[in-house]
């Protein structure tokens, strides 16, 4: 199955703060990123790891990512402990490993291998290079795995984390994922490590220890659980599931999937909508689109309309596997750009039983024709020429051009639409969130070829609701979609509202 984890995920089968720190330490050490490693080593000490535990993680890693990386990481830890001691911080030293009472570590290592793997170590390469078998048994699984200041579960967690950020080690990674599971690491925890790894490779924060706050006031009566699942392109999606008050896993609930605006993440208005609908008794799922936020997908910041449509169906897949979800009552709310993507998804996936869009954008039409269909043929050709030239540059240098829909500073000649978006996306008291990092400029060509309403009549007889602000610059997208859709359908115009007013209560 493409679904990574079909079990209800909760705090008991996600990584603890200490485990998150160990995974992050292992990743940064393997990558040789000493600046980030120093930060996460300090965080690990602050959340209860001992100096001995951190030393042991870094010592073991020499076997998996090389002596120079291990040595460099240990130097970083050594200097950090000196700095913290000078600041009066008393870090717990932790205990040293117990002595190993054996003169034949090759035998001990073989015994440890059997316990660790659940089977004898196999592989033609061990016959081809018997010295490797000798070193693995006597040293790695003998000397190192006999050191009892880290348990084997933690050692395998560290190993999986390190291998997950290295290139060319897929077979070894899969082998150690199996070893980790054999030693008590859950599939949900593996998925969390792999999401952290994707973020590590792309210079993003790694874990909930670094979690930026949501842009809205959270409701303590609503339980939120982070979940991970794959779409059909094998991209790992990260979502947050909002559970209604007095949630009972033995019941069957209607569910709503909430898609965020184009140029946004799940911690903004889609999360707010998810929370509000959970208050009304639904199980809701707010996800990050492929290539954005905490979701996977490389190269980062790509916009692939097909993937963004697929994300909705993948979310249906995952929800439909939960025992507390009624498969015949799964609906979608698409906000802004996700409105267009969700229309396309509902046209193609009859499992989506109802659809609502809010301040919908047809990103294909907006990119092809400009807002208000104001783009000339000459301007369109010029944009495609710019995209083509940028592709040459990226092919030559590998450096992407990243485009933000909202400028960092508002110019004096900014129009009303730019001011409206700026007041939300660049306002730290309203909608700004650091997890959104823009899109690739070259993605505009793919968007031009996106026609989300091509099969909109196929949504019928399932109901569709289009919601738009009375004064929204985007209102015509909803009106045109309403005209093209078949019954049952409804167009609701919110009096006095503009486009962004429907994102949050501050509008």
Where are these predicted regions, by residue range?
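Short beta-strand/loop motif that positions the catalytic acidic residue
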Residues: 459, 466-468
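Alpha/beta-hydrolase-fold enzymes
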Residues: 343-424
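Alpha/beta-hydrolase active-site loop
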Residues: 269, 302-323
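Conserved alpha/beta-hydrolase
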Residues: 276-296
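N-terminal cap/lid segment of alpha/beta-hydrolase-fold proteins
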Residues: 206-251, 503-504
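The serine-hydrolase catalytic nucleophile loop
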Residues: 263-275, 289
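Short, small-residue-biased leader/transition segments that mark boundaries at the very start
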Residues: 2-5
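Catalytic histidine-centered segment of alpha/beta-hydrolase-like enzymes
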Residues: 497-506
């Amino acid at each position: 199955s493409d679904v990574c984890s079909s079990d209800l995920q909760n705090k008991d089968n996600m990584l603890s703060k200490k485990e998150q720190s160990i995974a992050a330490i292992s990743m940064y050490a393997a990558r040789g990123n000493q600046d980030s490693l120093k930060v996460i080593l300090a965080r690990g000490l602050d959340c209860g790891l001992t100096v001995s535990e951190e030393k042991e993680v870094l010592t073991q890693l020499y076997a998996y990512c090389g002596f120079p990386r291990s040595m460099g990481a240990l130097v970083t830890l050594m200097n950090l402990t000196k700095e913290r001691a000078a600041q009066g911080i008393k870090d717990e030293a932790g205990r040293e490993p117990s002595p190993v009472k054996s003169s034949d570590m090759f035998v001990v290592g073989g015994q440890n291998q059997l316990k660790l793997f659940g089977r004898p170590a196999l592989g033609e390469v061990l016959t081809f290079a018997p010295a490797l078998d000798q070193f693995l048994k006597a040293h790695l699984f003998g000397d190192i795995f006999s050191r009892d200041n880290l348990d084997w579960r933690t050692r395998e967690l560290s190993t999986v984390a390190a291998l997950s950020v290295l290139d060319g080690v897929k077979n070894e990674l899969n082998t150690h994922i199996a070893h980790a599971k054999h030693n008590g690491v859950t599939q949900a925890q593996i998925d969390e490590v792999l999401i952290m790894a994707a973020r590590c490779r792309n210079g993003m924060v790694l874990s909930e220890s670094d979690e930026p706050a949501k842009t809205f006031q959270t409701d303590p009566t609503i339980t939120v659980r982070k979940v991970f699942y794959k779409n059909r392109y094998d991209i790992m999606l990260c979502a947050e599931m909002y559970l209604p008050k007095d949630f009972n896993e033995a019941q069957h609930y209607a569910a709503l999937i909430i898609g965020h605006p184009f140029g946004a993440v799940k911690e903004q208005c889609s999360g707010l909508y998810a929370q509000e609908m959970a208050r009304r008794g639904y199980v809701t799922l707010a996800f990050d689109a492929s290539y954005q936020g905490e979701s996977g997908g490389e190269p980062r910041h790509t916009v692939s309309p097909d993937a963004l449509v697929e994300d909705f169906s993948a979310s249906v897949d995952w929800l439909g596997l939960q025992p507390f979800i009624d498969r015949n009552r799964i609906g979608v709310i698409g906000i802004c750009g996700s409105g267009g993507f969700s229309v396309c998804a509902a046209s193609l996936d009859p499992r989506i039983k109802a659809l609502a869009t809010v301040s919908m954008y047809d990103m294909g039409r907006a990119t092809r024709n400009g807002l208000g269909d104001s783009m000339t043929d000459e301007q369109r050709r010029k944009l495609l020429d710019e995209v083509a030239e940028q592709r040459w540059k990226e092919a030559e240098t590998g450096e992407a051009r990243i485009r933000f829909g909202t400028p960092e500073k508002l110019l004096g000649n900014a129009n009303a639409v730019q001011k409206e978006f700026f007041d939300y996306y660049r306002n730290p008291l309203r909608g700004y969130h650091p997890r959104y990092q823009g899109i690739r400029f070259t993605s505009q060509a793919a968007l031009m070829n996106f026609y989300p309403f091509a099969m909109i009549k196929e949504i019928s007889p399932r109901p569709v609701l289009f919601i738009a602000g009375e004064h929204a610059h985007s209102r015509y997208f909803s009106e045109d979609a309403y005209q093209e859709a078949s019954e049952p359908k409804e167009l609701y115009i919110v009096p006095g509202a503009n486009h962004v007013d429907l994102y949050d209560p501050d509008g």
